[in-house]
């Protein structure tokens, strides 16, 4: 493991210890096959293709047989560590493992969901370029891919109680990019306070940071339903044929 990453190089952290199985019976969703490959393989590929990616650290369930089988098919070596009960725990443990292997606190880290198989090379480039350009000397600097909300929002349970103005509202995506030490500190602080951030940006916000919002693509969706699986399959098949999206 290289001891230091000179910007704009970065480490990729991918939390993949989840056991959400509602989509595929006994198979965690990140290992479900879509367009001929597991979701996680699609999610990893753009980072394998990016020369700025210095290395990959996955947080996995140590007894996950799906991971053990998949690991043998990877086109390049990756680092791995045991994940935690929650996403934030897995990311925190992965960051600690990177430091233990020689990464530096000032290094950049991108965190990406294993169940977001449609992230594009262009999105990754846009995020890295924008965050590095705005970083200056602020060790809390960082940012995330996001898409402005286009739908009308309603507040209510079974009935609409109010329409929520969508101006200034964004849908957060991944990857999310921060300096390793700053993100680790934010996650450790959240854990000590019993707080569970839903993403890395929220943990940084609790530290007073204002992460940069970098426009992402609406196709960069997270698979949570069977409808999502069908949608991402269409996206990936179109891309493999050189078509949009």
Regions found by a protein language model. Give the residues of each.
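N-terminal glycine-rich phosphate-binding loop and ensuing alpha1 helix
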Residues: 7-65
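Short acidic donor-binding/metal-coordinating loop in glycosyltransferase active sites
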Residues: 112-115, 174
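SAM-dependent methyltransferases
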Residues: 1-11, 199-201, 218-220, 228-245
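Residue-level signal for inorganic ion chemistry
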Residues: 14, 40, 94, 112-113, ...
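Short active-site oxyanion
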Residues: 52-56, 140-142, 219-220
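Short phosphate-binding loop-to-helix
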Residues: 72-107
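Conserved core of the sugar-phosphate nucleotidyltransferase
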Residues: 105, 119-215, 245
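Acidic metal-phosphate-binding loop of nucleotide-sugar-dependent transferases
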Residues: 87, 114-118
């Amino acid at each position: 493991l290289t001891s230091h990453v000179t910007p704009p190089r970065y480490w990729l952290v991918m939390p993949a210890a989840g056991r959400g199985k509602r989509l595929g019976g006994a198979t965690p969703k990140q290992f479900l096959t879509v367009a001929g490959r597991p979701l996680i393989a699609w999610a990893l590929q753009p980072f394998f293709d990016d020369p700025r990616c210095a290395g990959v650290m996955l947080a996995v369930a140590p007894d996950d047989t799906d991971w053990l089988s998949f690991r043998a098919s990877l086109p390049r070596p990756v680092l791995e560590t045991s994940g935690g009960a929650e996403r934030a725990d897995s990311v925190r443990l992965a960051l600690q493992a990177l430091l233990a292997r020689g990464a530096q606190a000032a290094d950049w880290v991108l965190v990406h969901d294993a169940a977001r198989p449609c992230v594009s090379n262009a999105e990754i480039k846009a995020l890295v370029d924008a965050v590095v350009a705005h970083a200056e000397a602020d060790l809390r600097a960082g940012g995330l891919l996001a898409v402005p909300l286009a739908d009308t929002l309603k507040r209510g349970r079974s009935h609409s109680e109010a329409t929520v103005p969508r101006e200034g509202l964004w849908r957060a995506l991944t990857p999310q990019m921060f300096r390793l030490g700053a993100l680790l500190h934010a996650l450790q602080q959240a854990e000590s306070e019993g707080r569970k951030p839903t993403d890395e940006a929220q943990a940084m916000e609790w530290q007073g940071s204002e992460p940069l919002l970098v426009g992402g693509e609406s196709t960069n969706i997270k698979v949570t339903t069977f409808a999502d699986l069908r949608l991402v399959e269409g996206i990936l098949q179109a891309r493999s044929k050189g078509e949009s999206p």
